Amino acid sequence: MENNEIEKGHVFSLADIVNYVPNSVISHTILRKATGTVNVVSVDSGKELIERTSPFDTFILLIEGKAEVMIETKSFPLDAGQAIIIPAHTRNSIVGIVRSKIMSTIIKSGYEEVIM
């Protein structure tokens, strides 16, 4: 995973931040702070971001392509330009139906804790 932040004060294209790599998921960090992160991810067709559960809400924007977001057992197909908020404490994954680029934004407000 690439962790070099994007230079501040400069215009950039989200779609140009990461390239597609066959059979891979590639991530690049735009911004990383103690209060949250913004990443752009490229997902090859049929590849899946690792299933996980986050203690924070996650905003997902599909930049290009077509992807399926799974939240618990419910499927949400996304087309380019569409977005979804994955609620905190839910099992989720993202699969590229075709090659896709995704922006993921996590904002940590400080009140979240793992609920058991």
Can you describe what each PLM-predicted range is?
Residues 1-35:
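A short, N-terminal "cap"/entry segment at the start of jelly-roll beta-barrel domains
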Residues 56-67, 72:
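Glycine- and acidic-residue-biased ligand/ion/polar-headgroup-sensing regions
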